[in-house]
Amino acid sequence: CLGVGSCNDFAGCGYAIVCFW
């Protein structure tokens, strides 16, 4: 659930955590 680069699911978190492009 860590990292940046997507507005979609992060590694199976089920929701966006951060939204950097």
Curated annotation (Swiss-Prot):
Task performed by this protein: Inhibits chicken myosin light chain kinase with an IC(50) of 8 M. Does not inhibit bovine cAMP-dependent protein kinase or rat protein kinase C. Antibacterial activity against the Gram-positive bacteria B.subtilis, E.faecium and S.aureus. No antibacterial activity against the Gram-negative bacteria E.coli, K.pneumoniae, P.aeruginosa, P.vulgaris, S.sonnei and S.typhosa. No antifungal activity against C.albicans.
GO MF: protein kinase inhibitor activity
Domain of life per record: Bacteria
GO biological process: defense response to Gram-positive bacterium; negative regulation of protein kinase activity
Disulphide bond pairs: 1-13, 7-19
Covalent link (3-cysteinyl-aspartic acid (Cys-Asp)) residue numbers: 1-9
Organism: Streptomyces sp
D-tryptophan: residues bearing it: 21
Protein name per Swiss-Prot or TrEMBL: Tricyclic peptide MS-271
Keyword Disulfide bond in record: yes
Keywords: Antibiotic, Antimicrobial, D-amino acid, Disulfide bond, Protein kinase inhibitor, Thioether bond
